[in-house]
UniProtKB/Swiss-Prot annotation:
Keyword rRNA-binding in record: no
Main location group: cytoplasm
Cofactor(s) required for function per UniProt: Mg(2+)
Organism phylogeny: Bacteria, Pseudomonadati, Pseudomonadota, Gammaproteobacteria, Oceanospirillales
Protein's name in the database: GTPase Obg
Positions contributing to Mg(2+) binding: S173, T193
Length: 391
């Protein structure tokens, strides 16, 4: 199934039914008085998360969703039938944004209850409501109210505890295969990973966490180069980042330069993302002798002045992966406990995630606008004809 993490849809709630103009008619009752009922309410539009859905692909093809209108009122004080609500099911982790106002209407991180995104119109009043001492036969009714209409952007961000990032071919997909049951495609060429992959990592029988692998980043990603920029937003909800580094690049390039380049791209894409805790994982140590690998890691750490955690692994051979998994599990459990017991820490983390998501949303929209402008400029240039007159 195609992975789609963004879609734009139009939703229209139903209109309320009109109130009824009616008078009671019975044998031997000449002036029965008004008995027009109210109109029924229109249908609301809701959005609800569903764990059985993992892509927004359906909303690429069906973009307009209309709830039914309420039925008009009837005589004998009968209220018109209200329309049924419609519920749009989306993956867990979907954010719903009003395109006209940029208001975030819902952030669906669980499946507890649906969220209303378009409110239906109320039914109109029948003429029975307008009877008075001076007007025993009112002919006045009211129309049903129109329902809300909105243009919405659905944005899917995967929910994971740990996010993997790094240059193409650093071994991220191999690592996620080594530590989880996920089976992403692995090959000896860049950009093998084209979409985010999720894997559940089990440290023990009852201890587990989720890791997300996104396409590799390259220099200039924050300006739209490569594939990874589109998927950086999926790291917004992770608790920490694993920066996977190829310790023995085939092109002889410097791993330290790769680390700096990725850090720069993170900061340019979202300063809040650059603030996320990040661990260095040096991969492919099996391609070097033990003492050579350790010496190279020490030299890189010294050159960068790195103060965070450092791990050495060979994802292909499974070396060092178990130690990494237990270290990650312990760190995640510590953070979960802190969020439950320390309100200040929980508030700070929530603020960081909110800033990260806002910055990521703004940056992605900027890049899309730039891409549209570039395409428009190319189209304009295609029709330019230069005429040169020569003697």
């Amino acid at each position: 199934m195609q992975f789609v993490d963004e879609a734009t849809i139009d939703v229209h709630a139903g209109k309320g039914g009109d109130g009824c103009l009616s008078f009671r008619r019975e044998k031997y009752v000449e002036f029965g008085g008004p008995d027009g009922g109210d109109g029924g309410a229109g249908g609301h539009v809701f959005v609800q998360a569903d764990t059985n859905i993992n892509t927004l692909v359906d909303y690429r093809y069906d973009r307009i969703f209309k709830a039914r209108n309420g039925e008009p009122g009837k005589g004998r004080q009968m209220t018109g039938k209200s329309a049924e609500d419609i519920i749009l099911y989306v993956p867990v982790g979907t954010t719903v944004v009003d395109l006209d106002t940029d208001e975030v209407l819902a952030d669906l991180t669980d499946t507890d209850k649906p969220v209303m995104v378009a409110q239906a119109g109320r039914g109109g009043l029948g003429n029975i409501h307008f009877k008075s001492s001076v007007n025993q036969a009112p002919r006045k009714t009211t129309k049903g109210k129109p329902g809300e209409s909105r243009r919405l952007r659905l944005e899917l961000k995967v929910l994971a505890d740990v996010g993997l990032l790094g240059m193409p071919n650093a071994g991220k997909s191999t690592l996620i295969r080594a530590i989880s049951a996920a089976k992403p495609k692995v090959a000896d060429y860049p950009f093998t990973t084209l979409i985010p992959n999720l894997g559940v990592v089990k440290a023990d029988r009852y201890r587990s966490f989720v890791v997300a692998d996104i396409p590799g980043l390259i220099e200039g990603a924050a300006e739209g180069a490569g594939l990874g920029i589109r998927f950086l937003k999926h790291l917004a909800r992770t608790r920490l980042l694993l920066h996977v580094v190829d310790l023995a690049p085939m092109d002889g390039s410097s791993p330290a330069n790769h680390i700096d380049a990725i850090a720069d791209e993170l900061d340019r894409f979202s300063p809040a993302l650059a603030e996320q805790e990040r661990w260095l994982v040096f991969n492919k140590i099996d391609l070097l002798a033990d003492d050579e690998a350790q010496a190279q890691v020490d030299a890189i750490v010294d050159e960068l002045g790195w103060q965070g955690p450092v791990f050495k692994v060979s994802a292909a051979a499974g070396v060092g992966c178990e130690d990494l998994v237990y270290a990650l599990m312990n760190a995640i459990e510590d953070r979960r406990l802190l969020e439950r017991e320390d309100p200040a820490y929980a508030a700070a983390q929530q603020d960081l995630r909110a800033r990260l998501e806002e910055e990521a949303r703004e940056r992605v929209q900027e890049l899309k606008a730039e891409a549209r402008q570039a395409r428009q400029n190319d189209d304009d240039d295609d029709h330019d004809v230069e005429v040169v007159y020569e003697p």
